[in-house]
Amino acid sequence: GLTYTLFRPSVPYVCVGHQYLFLHQNFEFPDKNSFQLRMLRFFTKMTAVRSSKKLALSFNDMEPDRVEQVVVVPPLIRQEVTAIQPEEGNYIHGYMVNSGFADSVEEFHTIYPEVPLRFFWDKADADEVTRIDETLSFYQIDDVKFLNGMAGCRAYATTAGFESICEAMYLGKPVLMVPAHIEQDCNCLLYTSD
């Protein structure tokens, strides 16, 4: 957006991303801090300044918003995901964008030690696998292992990001979302709406 504002290239561009749904006139925002919501919309608008069209990725169907030039399209699912054959395992598969969330996972594990948990994280000083006990392990991020784990899990738990939630839903996995910030609050509301 800023490149097109400052340098005005002659080549048109199209923005693609789930966040462009926030610009759609019919998108319903959660009842959250109005300043944060305004900043979210402002930042999203800034990334799309002078775009010829915005493709908003979503599982929900919505009519095009001609004023904001937003067209809602299905999510982009990686070929690696579409090639996987899902199975129902006995464990909850998870991803933590911040390894600090491990405390919350361990707290849950203390209350429900019988529930097998396999969470992926990006913790620089951790081993490839950090095994807490028989039913709780943390794994370093590895795309292939992560997707195989998702394909074989019983359910998926993560913050309410976009891509991995879409992949889990594509594979038919139940999803638990724990939003960590305003954009994820919006995603959570979107996923739970009809």
Question: Which role does the model predict for each range below?
Answer:
Residues V11-V72:
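Active-site-proximal region of nucleotide-activated glycan assembly enzymes
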Residues S10, S51-S52, G89, C153:
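Short, well-ordered alpha-helix to beta-strand connector turns
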Residues H18-F22, W121-A124, D142-V144, A180-Q184:
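Short, acidic/turn-prone active-site loops that include or flank metal/cofactor-
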Residues Y191-D194:
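Conserved small/polar residues in nucleotide/adenosyl-binding loops
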Residues G1-P9:
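An aromatic- and histidine-rich active-site surface loop
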Residues K145-N187:
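A donor-sugar binding/catalytic signature common to diverse glycosyltransferases
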Residues V14, K53-L55, V71, R118, ...:
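Hydrophobic/aromatic beta-strand patches that form the interior of the parallel beta-sheet core
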Residues V72-A155:
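Donor-nucleotide binding loops and adjacent catalytic segments primarily
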